[in-house]
């Protein structure tokens, strides 16, 4: 009913100046506070009489109004609503005051925290500064101590130097005095001896004359006595013919014995070496000697009891080459049986194609011994290379069973004599080889293997009756080689049943896998394929489980192919370089010939 008393509806109550936000609404009042509030309420709520008159008039009009009760109820409800709004406004103001107080507290705490931080920072800075000052003082003290120590050491060194100098001066003075005294002593002794010699000169001369006279008489008597004895002995010797003959015979026998011992020892040693030992150039041989029997008795017995076997056993070659090599083996065996002349053979082709293996098998099949030489061993011998070659062929000529002399890598010393840079020793060794192989022999057969036969001297090529080329294995040969080595190095150890054998074979078709690998390894030699299978075995041993899987085979095969490609690239570069050098040498030779 604010409209009855002239109070505006939207008027906001004023907050007293001395209102405290933290005081409770019904809290106790301070002394004198009630009187001030009473005086202020009279001033704040005083109204004039016109308002009452209007209210009375409005009440009378309202009583006359037919809807007076509803209007009164509406007014009461509006008054209640207004009171609620005033209460809400009051609560908002109280909340704002509380927020202001909390903000004031927060700001105060923030300021206090900042103050503490600044104080801490200042204290830290002060502590650091004090620490720096302390360190500086400590460093200065250490530096001062170091300077004092250096000064003390310097003074001590100077003192020691002075003492050492004084000691040296004292010693030098003592030595000088001692030397002076010794000189004076020697001078005095010399003068005394000289004076004594002058005083005793006549006596000394008389003694010397007597001594020399006695020596002269003694020497003359010795000469006379020796001459008489020698003369009487010669007279007796010359008058006795028996003694003369005995002396001449003794001297002759002594000379003959000395010469025989000197020359006979060397001849006997060479004979024993040629019969019992083997030449130094022979790297490997199946020929049994007494020395070999003493060194390796078991191996010697096995070699003596060995039987003939197929020369192509374990050697995988193309069919045409197998037929030709089998004919050579049969021819060699029949030649030995009929005591005919052996034919010299040259095997040429890429390395690792079975040349050395077939040469050894050929010797075992034909009943001959074999001796393996290496061409690279001759060049380091220098001037001794010629005698070493003669020893080899002399040793081969004395073989009772017959001997196959196999020279591997023969192009190392059988090169063309017109080649630039060939040493005189190598040329002499080549001439000795040509001399010993000029005619065919019934005692030995010469087999030479080379990777570069085009480097041979023409005279060397004329010594060979047959030239056999060993080519790289084809598809079928690679399959046979892989299966053979796989069975030897992997299948047999894996199925041996030995507890100490770690190798195991995974469940896969290894025959098909070998055929697949054979298709990928085109251009590889038999030795490379053997190393490939051995690499599979090594990888299986290196694995955690010791099982050879298909993945291990594929991985090692890929690595081997990459390595083979690198080798082929290196070989092509080397061949190109060699051809360029030959062309350059030929051009230079033509120019020199033209000049």
Swiss-Prot record:
Keyword ATP-binding among UniProt keywords: yes
Q: Note the SS bond partners.
A: none
Q: What happens when the gene is disrupted?
A: RNAi-mediated knockdown results in an increased adult lifespan. RNAi-mediated knockdown at the L1 stage of larval development results in arrest in the majority of animals at this larval stage. Some surviving animals arrest during the subsequent larval stages. RNAi-mediated knockdown in young adults results in a gradual decrease in the reproduction rate over time whereby initially fewer embryos are produced as compared to wild-type animals, and eventually adults fail to reproduce. The few embryos that are produced by the young adults are viable, but animals arrest at the L1 larval stage.
Where, if anywhere, are coiled coils annotated?
A: 80-107, 140-175
| UniProt keyword list | ATP-binding, Coiled coil, Membrane, Mitochondrion, Mitochondrion inner membrane, Mitochondrion nucleoid, Nucleotide-binding, Transmembrane, Transmembrane helix
Any one Gene Ontology cellular component term annotated for this protein: mitochondrial inner membrane
Q: Which Pfam families match?
A: AAA (PF00004), ATAD3_N (PF12037)
Topological domain ranges for the Mitochondrial matrix compartment: 261-595
**Ranges where the record places region Disordered:** 1-48
Q: Which domain of life is it from?
A: Eukaryota
This protein's membrane topology, according to the annotation, is: Single-pass membrane protein
Give the stretches traversing the membrane.
244-260
Which residues point to the Mitochondrial intermembrane side? 1-243
- Does the keyword Transmembrane belong to this entry? yes
Q: Which SUPFAM superfamilies match?
A: P-loop containing nucleoside triphosphate hydrolases (SSF52540)
GO terms assigned for molecular function: ATP binding; ATP hydrolysis activity
Q: What is this protein called?
A: ATPase family AAA domain-containing protein 3
Source organism of the structure: Caenorhabditis elegans
């Amino acid at each position: 009913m604010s409209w009855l008393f002239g109070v505006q509806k939207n008027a906001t109550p004023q907050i007293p100046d001395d209102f405290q936000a933290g005081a409770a609404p019904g809290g106790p009042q301070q002394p004198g506070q009630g009187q001030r509030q009473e005086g202020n309420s009279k001033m704040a709520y005083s109204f004039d009489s016109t308002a009452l008159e209007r209210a009375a008039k409005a009440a009378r009009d309202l009583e006359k109004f037919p809807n007076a009760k509803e209007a009164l109820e509406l007014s009461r409800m509006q008054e209640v609503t207004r009171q609620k709004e005033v209460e809400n406004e009051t609560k908002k103001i109280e909340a704002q005051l509380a927020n202001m107080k909390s903000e004031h507290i927060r700001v105060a705490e923030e300021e206090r925290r900042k103050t503490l931080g600044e104080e801490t920072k200042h204290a830290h800075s002060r502590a650091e500064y004090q620490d720096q000052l302390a360190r500086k003082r400590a460093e200065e003290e250490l530096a001062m101590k170091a300077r004092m120590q250096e000064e003390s050491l310097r003074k001590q060194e100077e003192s020691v130097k002075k003492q050492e100098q004084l000691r040296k001066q004292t010693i030098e003075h003592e030595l000088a005095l001692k030397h002076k005294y010794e000189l004076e002593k020697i001078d005095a002794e010399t003068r005394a001896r000289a004076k004594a010699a002058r005083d005793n000169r006549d006596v000394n001369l008389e003694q010397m004359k007597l001594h020399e006279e006695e020596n002269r008489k003694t020497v003359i008597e010795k000469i006379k006595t020796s001459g008489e004895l020698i003369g009487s002995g010669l007279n007796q010797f010359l008058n006795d013919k028996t003694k003369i003959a005995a002396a001449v015979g003794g001297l002759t026998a002594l000379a003959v014995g000395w010469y025989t011992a000197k020359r006979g020892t060397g001849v006997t040693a060479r004979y024993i070496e040629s019969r019992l030992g083997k030449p130094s150039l022979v790297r490997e041989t199946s020929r049994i000697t007494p020395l070999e029997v003493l060194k390796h008795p078991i191996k010697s017995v096995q070699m003596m009891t060995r039987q003939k076997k197929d020369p192509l056993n374990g050697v995988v070659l193309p069919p045409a080459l197998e037929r030709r090599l089998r004919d050579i083996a049969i021819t060699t065996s029949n030649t030995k049986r009929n005591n005919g002349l052996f034919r010299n053979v040259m095997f040429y082709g890429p390395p690792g194609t079975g040349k050395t293996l077939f040469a050894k098998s050929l010797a075992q099949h034909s009943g001959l011994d074999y001796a393996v030489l290496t061409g690279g061993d001759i060049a380091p011998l220098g001037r001794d290379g010629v005698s070493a070659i003669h020893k080899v062929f002399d040793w081969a000529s004395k073989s009772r069973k017959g001997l196959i002399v196999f020279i591997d890598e023969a192009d190392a010393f059988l090169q063309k004599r017109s080649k630039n840079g060939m040493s005189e020793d190598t040329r002499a060794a080549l001439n000795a080889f040509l001399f010993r192989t000029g005619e065919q022999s019934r005692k030995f057969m010469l087999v030479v293997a080379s990777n570069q036969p085009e480097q041979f001297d023409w005279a060397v090529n004329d010594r060979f009756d047959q030239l056999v080329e060993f080519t790289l294995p084809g598809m079928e040969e690679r399959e046979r080689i892989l299966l053979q080595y796989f069975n030897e190095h992997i299948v047999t150890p894996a199925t041996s049943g030995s507890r100490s054998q770690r190798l195991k074979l995974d469940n896969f078709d290894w025959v098909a896998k070998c055929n697949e690998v054979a298709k990928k390894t085109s251009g590889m030699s038999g030795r490379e394929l053997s190393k490939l299978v051995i690499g599979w075995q090594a990888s299986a041993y290196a694995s955690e489980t010791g099982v050879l899987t298909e993945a291990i085979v594929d991985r090692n095969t890929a690595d081997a192919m990459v390595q083979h490609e690198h080798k082929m690239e290196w070989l092509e570069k080397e061949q190109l370089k060699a051809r360029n050098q030959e062309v350059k040498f030929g051009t230079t030779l033509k120019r020199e010939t033209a000049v």
